[in-house]
């Protein structure tokens, strides 16, 4: 992209951020629909896990975002990876347990899990944008 004019490059970069914002808002809408369509607010429990998911990396990972993907001897980084993985499993386990207990139906389970998948795609998209060669998004 070195030969692309600056104004076009900025427009494309803002398009990527807008796409990520649309993904996140779609995930929020799916989460609310999982609750509102079936008049059952139990699926909102998985929102707690969505909020807790990035916390270990924020507290223990520091400013190095690549520490999640690299092998490390630092015990704090390893603890952050473990707690993040446990939160990710909990994000899928909570709706599954609620369905098994009979508190939510199949539709709410499908919407809740699809919300999780949309959030996951948004996070992976953010990581891919953050790994760009120009490090333009390092301030976000």
From Swiss-Prot:
Membrane topology listed for this record: Multi-pass membrane protein
Keywords: Endosome, Membrane, Protein transport, Transmembrane, Transmembrane helix, Transport
Intervals, Cytoplasmic compartment: 1-16, 62-75, 130-140
GO BP: protein transport
Transmembrane intervals: 17-37, 41-61, 76-98, 109-129
Gene Ontology cellular-component terms listed: endosome membrane; plant-type vacuole
UniProt superkingdom: Eukaryota
Location in the cell: Endosome membrane
Lumenal compartment segments: 38-40, 99-108
Family: Belongs to the OB-RGRP/VPS55 family.
Reported function: Involved in endosomal protein transport.
Protein name, per record: Vacuolar protein sorting-associated protein 55 homolog
Gene source species: Arabidopsis thaliana
């Amino acid at each position: 992209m070195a030969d692309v004019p600056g104004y076009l490059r900025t427009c494309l970069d803002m398009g990527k951020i807008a796409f990520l914002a649309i993904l996140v808002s779609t995930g929020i809408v799916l989460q609310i629909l999982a609750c509102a369509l079936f008049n059952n607010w139990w699926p909102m429990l998985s929102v707690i896990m969505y909020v807790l998911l990035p916390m270990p990396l924020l507290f223990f990972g520091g400013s190095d975002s690549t520490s999640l993907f690299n092998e490390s001897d630092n015990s704090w980084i390893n603890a952050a990876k473990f707690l993040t993985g446990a939160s990710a499993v909990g994000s899928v386990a909570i709706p599954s347990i609620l369905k098994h207990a009979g508190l939510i139906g199949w539709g709410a389970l499908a919407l809740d899990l699809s919300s999780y998948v949309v959030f996951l795609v948004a996070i992976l998209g953010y990581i891919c944008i953050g790994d760009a060669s120009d490090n333009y998004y390092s301030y976000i």
